[in-house]
Regions:
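Intrinsically disordered, low-complexity regulatory segments of kinases
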Residues: 1-255
Length: 255
């Protein structure tokens, strides 16, 4: 938005609405210190629907972190924590670097389709992210479950949430299946935006679960992903329809 810096405060509020304040409360219930701010402000939403973006230019930069896979048997990942694979959190060597990319792609795919992150945490804390992985995808491998130092702050031994939960997190989000239902914005097969009867919801869940398999060797390759049911029956046909629509009704080039 090239004209954003030139907006006055009133013009900014008129275009993007008033700031949203939320009171700050301490986890232990005690009153805040005198120097602490009484409120936090939600970030301003600058996003727009994808179908309203004209001629988007995607610029990719590796920030000097890319590497040649065959020549780098155990790379150091520079992936942001929210999108990092679980093996990186547990300090295991990245021996399947393409599998790490598949996990990251799966997390991104969910966010693109769902309009919100799959693993929602405060300040991208590593332990909160691990807990969200388990909450969404199920029990991790035993070696990770047993070696997780702060597991007792989240889960009982049987995998249930601790009753006296004191982390800055929200342990109420459902499993991946329920999140996909919520993403479909409907509570029945008739009102859900997914083609539930035709198998779209199931096929999408199968795709995402495969991409976010805890064990790296169990994740599909990129070539295998292209042959998954969701890609063949829904993603590719939707892409072809979109290309046909663009060729029939070219987007207005004026901004």
């Amino acid at each position: 938005m090239p004209d954003l810096d030139g907006l006055s405060t009133s013009e900014l509020y008129k275009r993007f609405d008033q700031p949203r304040e939320v009171p700050i409360q301490r986890v232990d219930g005690k009153p805040g210190e005198p120097h602490a701010p009484p409120h936090a402000i939600y970030p301003m939403a600058l996003s727009i629907p994808a179908d309203e973006v004209h001629d988007p230019e995607i610029i990719i930069s590796d920030k000097r972190t890319s590497f040649i896979v065959p020549q780098t048997p155990s790379p150091t990942l520079c992936t942001p924590a929210l999108y990092s694979p679980p093996e990186d959190f547990f300090n295991e060597p990245i021996t399947h670097s393409t599998a790490a990319d598949i996990w990251t792609l799966g997390v991104n795919l969910y966010e693109v389709l769902g309009e919100r992150p799959l693993f929602e945490t405060f300040a991208w804390d590593g332990d909160d992210i691990i807990a969200e992985m388990i909450n969404s995808l199920g029990q991790p491998p035993t070696r990770w479950w047993n070696s997780w130092v702060k597991r007792s702050e989240f889960f009982e031994e049987d995998g249930s949430w601790v009753a006296d939960f004191r982390r800055i997190s929200t342990p109420v989000f459902g499993r991946l299946h329920q999140r996909l239902w919520d993403m479909g914005r409907g509570e029945t097969e008739q009102t859900c935006e997914w083609d539930v009867a035709g198998g779209e919801l199931r096929a999408l869940e199968d795709l995402l679960r495969a991409m976010m398999t805890f064990e790296p060797p169990g994740r599909p390759t990129a070539d295998q992903l292209l042959r998954y049911e969701y890609m063949v029956k829904w993603a590719f046909p939707a892409w072809e329809r979109q290309k046909m629509q663009e060729s029939t009704h070219p987007a207005d080039k004026e901004h």
